[in-house]
């Protein structure tokens, strides 16, 4: 699956067309149904505005919100998004009480002059995800004929399909892969994701560094496997570094995370790194704690001293940070997935802050820095540096699967240029 040859929305004539856009409006709501963080709505604005400005007859937005499990549940209605979207767009938005059916088709077909229509939650229908849950919480597969009918129902609402929901691109859901229109284009968000991941995975400026954190080696094995033939260096940090240190160098790790299953593959990873001439950088010192808490007794340890029993490593220490800074400064492409420490707790956030500073410096001096979703994206948001990094991915699971070398159904379904 080539990432760089997908049809962008800018190559499609939208004049007079009904433009059906899959957005990601899966936003958090408080108990009064107010949107508490509109970031995902803001993210979709460039694509929505582009369709309006380029003469679309109707701009039809479809999304999921939460996990209603294939049944109508007012708690997960997309209606609270309407006032937020109206304010951001500066124009009225029509809400359709269902995402398919004759009434919805009538609303869409009557629209003119770029009228924006937001459809109700796709996941109120079991046919979106392909299954629902019964009263006992067991999965019930949706009937194939019903799924086909639902997909036809969505297809009937547009002349052109645009996907701007990268966060759901790894799911083969009906709204991602089942809309059967001649032109299926990438919106601006998806286009940016694909461009940056193509830069890293298909034609990186070298040296190419990957920084991988996370708890378990076994969770990241596919990722490491797919990246080793592509990168020049690899920083292994976070909880999974302890499995490497104990297995390779017999460092005493106290009560730190140890991944028994992962430890069996550490040797293979090191051999493969040698084969591809990849330098693996591991931490050499640690910030320790007697419990997983902000008010823990904090200590320091090195490889030589080891971490004493009763203590665990929750961050890497200043010497490790220096190693990371040097490696980051030498790289031209940096892909970062997983923080070095438990940044949510203040005493164990300093290596994450220092790594982030180094990444920002690298981006400012012209390197391409990509943050791959999930916890690391949370870090970038927490320290308000998203605009200082070349690209912060919006899709945790989707970016991880892409980096693991998997094909994303939502991307594969798009037309080629």
UniProtKB/Swiss-Prot annotation:
Q: Which cofactor does it need?
A: Mg(2+)
Task: State where CDP binds.
Answer: 214, 219, 238, 338, 343
Query: What's a single GO MF annotation on this record?
Result: phosphoglycerate kinase activity
Alphabetized, the UniProt keywords read:
ATP-binding, Cytoplasm, Glycolysis, Kinase, Magnesium, Metal-binding, Mitochondrion, Nucleotide-binding, Transferase
Q: Which Pfam family, any one, appears in the UniProt record?
A: PGK
- Got a GO cellular component term for this one? cytosol
CDD domains, from UniProt? Phosphoglycerate_kinase
Q: Which reaction does it catalyse?
A: (2R)-3-phosphoglycerate + ATP = (2R)-3-phospho-glyceroyl phosphate + ADP
Name the Enzyme Commission number(s) assigned to this protein: 2.7.2.3
The biological pathway it contributes to is: Carbohydrate degradation; glycolysis; pyruvate from D-glyceraldehyde 3-phosphate: step 2/5
Protein's job: Catalyzes one of the two ATP producing reactions in the glycolytic pathway via the reversible conversion of 1,3-diphosphoglycerate to 3-phosphoglycerate. Both L- and D- forms of purine and pyrimidine nucleotides can be used as substrates, but the activity is much lower on pyrimidines. Negatively regulates the biosynthesis of acetyl-CoA from pyruvate in the mitochondrion.
Record text on subunit structure and interactions: Monomer.
Name the protein family.
Belongs to the phosphoglycerate kinase family.
- Name listed for the protein in its UniProt record: Phosphoglycerate kinase
- The protein's organism comes out as Penicillium citrinum
